[in-house]
Curated annotation (Swiss-Prot):
Catalytic activity: Cleavage of Arg-|-Ala bond in complement component C4 to form C4a and C4b, and Lys(or Arg)-|-Lys bond in complement component C2 to form C2a and C2b: the 'classical' pathway C3 convertase
Sushi domain residues: 292-356, 357-423
GO molecular function (one): serine-type endopeptidase activity
Signal sequence annotation: 1-15
Protein name per its UniProtKB record: Complement C1s subcomponent
(3R)-3-hydroxyasparagine PTM sites in chain numbering: N149
Ranges of residues in domain EGF-like: 131-172
First-level EC class: hydrolase
Post-translational modification (record): The iron and 2-oxoglutarate dependent 3-hydroxylation of aspartate and asparagine is (R) stereospecific within EGF domains.
Biological process, per Gene Ontology: complement activation, classical pathway; innate immune response; proteolysis
Organism: Sus scrofa
Domain CUB: 16-130, 175-290
Record's function text: C1s B chain is a serine protease that combines with C1q and C1r to form C1, the first component of the classical pathway of the complement system. C1r activates C1s so that it can, in turn, activate C2 and C4. Also cleaves IGFBP5 and thereby inhibits the trophic effects of IGF1.
Enzyme Commission number(s) of this protein: 3.4.21.42
Amino acid sequence: MWCIVLLSLLAWVDAEPTMYGEILSPNYPQAYPNEVEKSWDIEVPEGYGIHLYFTHLDIELSENCAYDSVQIKSGGREEGKLCGQKTSKNPKSAVVEEFQVPYNKLQVIFTSDFSNEERFTGFAAYYVAVDVNECTDFADSPCSHFCNNYIGGYFCSCPPEYFLHEDKKNCGVNCSGDVFTTLIGEVASPNYPNPYPENSRCDYQILLEEGFQVVVTMRREDFDVEPADSGGHCPDSLIFVAGNQQFGPYCGNGFPGPLTIETKSNALNIIFQTDETEQKKGWKFRYHGDPIPCPKEVTANSFWEPEKAKYVFKDVVKITCLDGFEVVQGTVGSTSFYSTCQSNGKWSNSKLRCQPVDCGSPEPIPHGKVEDPEHTLFGSVTRYSCEQPYYYMETDGSEEYRCAGNGSWVNELLGAELPKCVPVCGIPSEPFKGMQRIFGGIITKIESFPWQVFFQNPRAGGALIDEQWVLTAAHVVEGNREPVMYVGSSSVVTSHLANGQMLTAERVFIHPGWEEQDASERKNFDNDIALVRLKDPVKMGPTVSPICLPGTSSDYDPSVGDLGLISGWGRTNTKDHVVKLRGAKLPVAPSDKCQEIKGTNPRIGTSSFVFTDNMICAGGRGVDSCNGDSGGAFAMQVPNEETPKFYVAGLVSWGPQCGTYGIYTRVKNYIDWIRETMQQNSAPSVD
């Protein structure tokens, strides 16, 4: 029997909800068994309540129905619990007990204990579906506004200008989608100044043309929104969103934010949200479009043209970097650029920066060095120096260079021109101490005559006067325009010449006043002077350095008796030529002394030779230069110098007889020609 009861119950549970039904206790109308617990789940269609009534009730009576009972539950809550015997109070009705619930589900539970002293027949009950007024029968109304009941259900409706949400219960206001595009206007909450609707979300947008920002102006008294709760949360709120900026949420009585809001954007979204509770009068504000301003600086270290108090959309300025700063784009640098105030309030080309000019590493100079500056940016300082003691700065004050605004290293005197280290002239590394004449004089070191040049063919001498110029006698080079020369060696033995520097002539310049004649018949040595430009500069050092040129003042006119130095590898009283350098001191002599000497050729007297003011007579008996010394320097001390310094007063030219007096070309008379020739031919010749 229990199996049959269970199957019938499962079949009843799985059945569709019915409008009515019967419930009987086990074995009804016979006595119900002991130790029974049975339940019935009643369900009627949605939209209906349940009316449950008993027509027979005969259950063991106990206090609080503790032994046997029939219990009625709805939604987990007990609606009633019955036991004992009951009869109808109305003679015209068989109903002894009834229950009515507004829900469509109900549970009936019958329980009996282990023994009954009497025979109890249980209960008979019936249920029917009854209409429920959902609008009034519940504590909370299911609709936010209007509730409409019908048999088996209800529906919600809304006032005019409201719409029903998707949940079909709550009403809201259709306040989204409005777009304001005028440059000035007013926006208000729905129904303002009457209470705004509940359960609403209003989305408005102000969209102005590019280049204008939306400026919101609010009065405090025009704002009244449900205030924040104890946790600071706004149940109803107003929010402004412009780009990635958010202003708000705002709520309360009186606007709590700034009364003027500059959004920096031409688009402003307005979001107003409300819940179902308290409603206030809402809000209103005015707005206007203001040209979007750009900041008053595009980049640092610059100035602007034109200068204005405020820059707005479409304004164009020229940005010029301050002195010492530049704009670097790739590998190209410039000092100015143009920038336009854009619609987003930002300057075009705002990524360009005026950076300090970088002059780069200072260029090296020949025969000198430059300090490595700490950095090479604008304002940095570096210093040049020359290789001492053989070179010095050609221009005093040209040592210090500063990184200038144009990106060049600049000196106050030379500008961007690099300093020049020129050879120190006239100072031998070892002073000459001998007193002997060269004709049979003493062996000396090249360090005492570092300007001495050896001409290999014809065997002769010359004087180094600059790193690329040799001064010699015209008769030395008139027959050989490509002479082979050496400097820096005391010995002219072929194997020893390698210790010095070989010089290559690039071009020979003979004085235009020199008359070319057969050497054996020559009687006129006037203007016996020539210049040789070297192909490559000579490196100076202790054995190689130039001799100074004479000045143009009268101090450089040698007086009779003044001593000078001569050097060379020419003939001596015992040898036709020597291989080791010899040097001597000899005095300046009156010119008539040279004219009185008889020559080695008895057929030609000295009276037939030409004597001019371009010649110096020097030497004496046993004190003279000779064959092989031609072109060498007759060196004298520079006047008024504390440190001994030598200049080339004369060049070995000719003499009637070796070992007596000799004739020297007076170099002072040719200074203009020398300097002019050197200046005009400073650049390498082009073949």
